[in-house]
Amino acid sequence: MDYPEQQIQHIIRSLTQYSHDDQRTALQDYFLPDAYFVHPFCRVPSFGNCKIPYTDLTVNSRQLVFYIYQWYRILSPDIKLSIDSTSFDKDKNLLYVMIRQTFTLWFVPLSLWQANVKLVTVLELQQLSTDKSHKPLLGETSTPVNGERPPKLYFIKGQQDHYQIEDFLQFVAPWGASLLWMAWQIYATIICTVGVIFLRTPVALCQKYFLGRDTRAIKTL
């Protein structure tokens, strides 16, 4: 990627909404072979090419990420997705993407079950020199060609998907579980409020006179 914030939308749609070939192309073009993947439901640790015993086949972590995205498309062939915002921290090489999606299962009739969720995807990027085919030069020293160094592009080193708990619950416990969690959150807020109103003074006095602690952080009214 030359411009991660502008190009990431096409990459995400290729992975989640387009064809099998588009998925594979996006992963091969933009993900490093040892890319890792972290999601509430699954995890792929980073590893390079490993030979499968008793075969001539090799596998790397990017291949497993491809299988995850393929299974995602198999379960939900018609995913509705929108990208609300992107932000690139160039110093840390982190790209943040806020996404809204509607996930439905193909075997549930009449869309009786849908998960309308929001998530923040954090992509760890790595800037590497590339060859003539725009492939990363992994572990190689870039040599100048005609006095010019090979161009550098950003590649995805890893992906982490972050969900709020109420959004996560829509996948594992639909039909009201997220509402119960929201009710618990409101209850916890009430407990915090009541605790401050009725317990701040006795707690501050106890900490000050019995424990000798500085109580300015919970200064009483």
Q: How should these model regions be labeled?
A:
Residues 1-221:
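C-terminal and inter-domain tail/linker signature
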